[in-house]
Regions:
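Divalent-cation
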Residues: 1-177
Length: 177
C-alpha cells in the first residue's frame, strides 16, 4: 500500500530482472532520449549470443561501466569516439568507434544514412540488438533479426531493450493489470 500511495507501484514492472539491470536499462534509455531530443546521432550495439569480436577489434577499447553520462559523451559530435558504433558486452561498454558491416538491402529507405545501414548490417550477420539515434530527425530506431523498427516511443524502446538485452518481458503494470 505504501508503494501505491507513493505512486511507485505503477512504475514497477512485471518481470524478474534485477535492480542492477533496471538501472542499466534506465541509463541507456535516458541517454538515448537525451541524444534524440538534441539530434545527436548514435549507434549502440548490444552483443547477445553471437560474438562480435571481429567488430570489437576495429574499435577503441573502453571496458567501462555503463552510465547515461558516458553514453551521451561518446556520441557528442566532433569528438574522437563519436563516429562508428559503441558495442556493449554484458553490462560493460567494450568499445567505441567500431566499424560494422553495411547492409546491401534494397528495403532500407534511401533517406536513411550509414548508421541505419550499419545497424541493419550487423543484425543480418548476428543476433545483436542495435539502437540508432538519427542526427537528422532525432528518431530512435532499433534493429534485430535483420529488421529495422523506426521512430519508436520511449516505452516501446525500453521494452525491446529489456527483452533483447536481458531476455525480460518488460511491460509496465498498471492498477488494473
Amino acid at each position: 500500500l505504501e508503494q501505491l500511495g507513493r505512486g511507485s507501484f505503477l512504475k514497477r514492472y512485471t518481470n524478474t530482472y534485477s535492480r542492477d539491470e533496471e538501472k542499466l536499462i534506465q541509463s541507456v534509455s535516458k541517454a538515448v532520449q537525451y541524444m534524440a531530443k538534441r539530434r545527436i546521432g548514435a549507434l549502440i550495439v548490444f552483443e547477445k549470443e553471437t560474438g562480435l569480436q571481429d567488430y570489437i577489434e576495429t574499435g577503441i577499447p573502453m571496458n567501462s561501466d555503463i552510465s547515461q553520462e558516458l553514453l551521451t559523451n561518446v556520441f557528442i559530435p566532433n569528438t574522437p569516439l563519436h563516429d562508428g558504433a559503441m558495442i556493449i558486452q554484458g553490462s560493460k561498454i567494450a568499445v567505441a568507434a567500431s566499424y560494422l558491416p553495411l547492409s546491401d538491402s534494397v528495403k532500407i529507405s534511401k533517406s536513411l544514412g550509414t548508421r541505419h545501414r550499419a545497424a541493419v548490417g550487423i543484425s543480418e550477420v548476428s543476433d545483436a540488438f542495435t539502437v540508432v539515434v538519427s542526427e537528422e530527425t532525432g528518431d530512435i530506431s532499433v534493429t534485430f533479426d535483420g529488421k529495422l523498427r523506426r521512430d519508436i516511443s520511449k516505452d516501446v524502446f525500453e521494452e525491446l531493450l529489456a527483452e533483447h538485452w536481458f531476455g525480460a518481458h518488460f511491460q509496465k503494470k498498471g492498477v488494473n493489470s
